UniProtKB/Swiss-Prot annotation:
Consists of two tandemly linked globin-like sequences which each bind a heme group and a C-terminal extension which may act as a cement between the eight subunits. This is Extracellular globin. Disulfide bonds: none annotated. GO terms for molecular function: heme binding; metal ion binding; oxygen binding; oxygen carrier activity. It comes from Ascaris suum. Heme b binds at Q82, H114, Q231, H263. Has an extremely high oxygen affinity. In a vacuum, it takes several minutes to release its oxygen compared to milliseconds for a normal globin. Could be used as an oxygen scavenger for sterol biosynthesis. Belongs to the globin family.
């Protein structure tokens, strides 16, 4: 009974908070209109002018308009229409914030809409948008601190849902491509792993240095060496597990760190660039096995980029940890001498 009461109180507090957030943000949106008037049209154009003036990296998502100035934005009819679309999206997100199910569903729909238009943006762009949107609103009206915090809250929850849904979509695309890459004890599965290493040794000779006594192997040598039968299955299993866990960010990151520690235990130290190159060669390997559409290539690039980032981060932490241990040993040695 007590648990039910506590749950009811928590639900009430969350609902009241969401209602207040919605109320504050909707009030500020009175200065960013959505209708057919010239004033509303200019409100939308002004948002894009602010974006193009202050966030030039975002221009690349507007094909053939990458070099636009604020004046170009003002004179292009595209932004009159697009400005109303983006403001409408902000109004809907704000209006539905106290209905989290609808808010999340609309957030996912916005991401899917961008995907259908072949516009793929990294997660940080969605976060940056709310910063620029708050700056834009600040030019239209005075935003007090509670209103700023309310927009921060909406932006944070929006970005969280985008990231969650985006990870599901990436996982789905990549898992589909792995249907053509069996792992197991069959001859086909064994050959899949060997083929990956043959591609590596043929096209990325610098990576051979990680294979002691096999640095001068040809693709034919790889084919004949039983080592690559077993190792091929290991590396493909790792790729399957990375893909399968991608929609669970914490598990994905933990598994990347486990892979790095496994290499360290084996005395294999690879330069950061190798981790980036691996995903490039893996995509090429998949392309040989089955045609990859652009969506799938992009999805693998997303996984590869995040993997490489985590691998590099782990390497830095490992190095710092070793240096700390060295300093500790030095201090201990000094104390022993005294």
């Amino acid at each position: 009974m007590r648990s039910l009461l506590l749950l009811s109180i928590v639900f009430f507090v969350v609902t009241v908070s969401a209602n207040k957030t919605r109320e504050l943000c909707m009030k500020s949106l009175e200065h960013a209109k959505v209708d057919t008037s010239n004033e509303a049209r200019q409100d939308g154009i002004d948002l894009y002018k602010h974006m193009f003036e202050n966030y030039p990296p975002l221009r690349k998502y507007f094909k053939n308009r990458e070099e636009y100035t604020a004046e170009d934005v003002q004179n292009d009819p595209f932004f009159a229409k697009q400005g109303q679309k983006i403001l409408l999206a902000c109004h809907v997100l704000c209006a539905t914030y106290d209905d989290r199910e609808t808010f999340n569903a609309y957030t996912r729909e916005l991401l899917d809409r961008h995907a259908r238009d072949h516009v793929h943006m990294p997660p940080e762009v969605w976060t940056d948008f709310w910063k620029l949107f708050e700056e834009y609103l600040g030019k239209k009206t005075t935003l007090d601190e509670p209103t700023k915090q309310a927009w921060h809250e909406i932006g944070r929850e929006f970005a969280k849902e985008i990231n969650k849904h985006g990870r599901h979509a990436v996982r789905h695309q990549c898992m589909r491509s792995l249907q053509h890459i069996d792992i197991g004890h069959s001859e086909t599965a064994k050959q899949n792993g060997i083929d990956l290493y043959k591609h590596m040794f043929e096209n990325y000779p610098s990576m051979r240095e990680a294979f002691k006594d096999r640095e001068n192997y040809t693709a034919e040598d790889v084919q004949k060496d039983p080592f690559f039968v077993k190792q091929g299955q290991r590396i493909l299993l790792a790729c399957h597990l990375l893909c399968a866990s991608y929609d669970d960010e914490e598990t994905f990151h933990m598994y990347v760190h486990e892979l790095m520690e496994r290499h360290e235990r084996l005395g294999v130290q690879l330069p950061d660039q190798h981790w980036t190159d691996f995903w490039k060669l893996f995509e090429e390997f998949l392309e040989k096995k089955s045609h990859l559409c652009e969506h799938t290539k992009h999805a693998w690039a997303v996984i590869g980029k995040e993997f490489a980032y985590e691998a590099t981060r782990h390497g830095k932490e490992h190095h710092e940890h070793k240096e700390e241990h060295k300093e500790e040993h030095k201090e201990e040695h000094k104390e022993e001498q005294h």
